Design a protein with these regions (language model features):
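Non-catalytic substrate-recognition/targeting regions of SAM-dependent transferases
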Residues: 8-24, 31-99, 108
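Conserved SAM-binding motif I beta-strand of class I
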Residues: 140-145
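C-terminal catalytic and target-recognition region of SAM-dependent MTase-like enzymes
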Residues: 228-282
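Conserved alpha-helix/loop element of class I SAM-dependent methyltransferases that forms part
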Residues: 101-116
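Conserved SAM-binding loop of SAM-dependent methyltransferases across substrates and taxa
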Residues: 127-139
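Conserved class I S-adenosyl-L-methionine
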Residues: 117-126
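S-adenosylmethionine
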Residues: 173-252
Length: 282
């Protein structure tokens, strides 16, 4: 399968990885986080990592974890930029800081394929990086997420980036997509970044392998003939072959490609970040 390499930028650097961890720079703040794909030996010894890192996320048990400060007065919240966009970052209890920088390649794709007359929808939109990129082009932008706190975070990112008029939808993404199909609405661009698993507001279980067919069924009806779709998958139970088969089922009459998403560290290691489906017009 094709490897799609994404890259960092001035405010983000994947410095090194190995031993089940990765070393990253976010602006001036450096973190150490767990990384299941970093099953190899790191280029630099961990002792070297600890000399420059500000925070390390440590898993102390099956359900317990903590951010350990390495430098005195290390900030728990800060911001970085991507071009004119500003992303507010902060330490969360789930090891994340509010941004998936490997998505940079998809942000660039969105920017290249939208214009001010376009209509764009971001499903499972998290803190809204793709929404900001879309809005920056002037496109009408709809941001859908089931977690209210994440929508608030995305709104802060919008304000910090001096943008406005993103439409916020606090709802289950799959249910909202199905309703949009029933309404007959269509989009010039759609991004879907569904979690591998989760538990909904009403305690319903979410497993990507059980929902992927429905997601793509809806997406087929929601994207315009000359529109595009980006789907990211991270689940070990949904491999590239599965995504390709479903893509052929729903988009066999269009151009599409399924790729493995990778990023190289500054030290020359390579990390795998799941699979990406892109449906587009050549």
């Amino acid at each position: 399968m094709k490897k799609l390499y994404t890259t960092g930028w001035s405010d983000y650097e994947l410095i090194d990885a190995g031993g089940g961890k990765k070393l990253e720079r976010w602006g001036e703040i450096i973190t150490i986080r767990p990384e299941i794909q970093a099953y190899f030996k790191s280029a630099k010894p961990v002792a070297e990592w600890l000399k420059i890192a500000h925070w390390e996320f440590i898993e102390t048990g099956a359900q317990a974890s903590v951010w350990k400060p390495i430098k005195i007065d290390a900030p728990v919240a800060w911001s970085i930029q991507y071009g004119d966009l500003v992303f507010q970052l902060k330490l969360t209890k789930f090891k994340h800081v509010g941004l998936f920088p490997e998505q940079r390649t998809n942000w660039d794709f969105i920017h290249a394929h939208l214009n001010p007359s376009a209509k764009f929808m971001n499903l499972f939109a998290y803190t809204g990086a793709a929404s900001l990129v879309a809005k920056k082009t002037g496109a009408e932008t709809i941001h859908v997420d089931s977690v209210k706190q994440l929508i608030s975070w995305a709104s802060e990112n919008m304000a910090a980036s001096r943008l406005d008029a993103i439409k916020w939808v606090h709802e289950d993404a799959l249910k909202f997509a199905a309703r949009e199909v029933n309404r007959g609405n269509q989009y010039d661009g759609i991004v879907m970044d569904p979690p591998a698993w989760g538990i909904g507001a009403k305690k319903e279980k979410w497993k990507l392998e059980d929902k992927l067919d429905d997601l793509l069924h809806n997406a087929k009806q929601l994207i315009k003939q000359k529109g595009f779709l980006i789907l990211n998958t991270y689940s070990p139970k949904v491999d590239g072959k599965t995504v390709a088969l479903l893509a052929k089922k729903y988009f066999g009459d269009r151009n599409f490609e399924v790729s493995e998403l990778w990023m190289r560290t500054t030290t020359g290691k390579e990390l795998y970040y799941g699979n990406v489906l892109r449906v587009y017009t050549a």
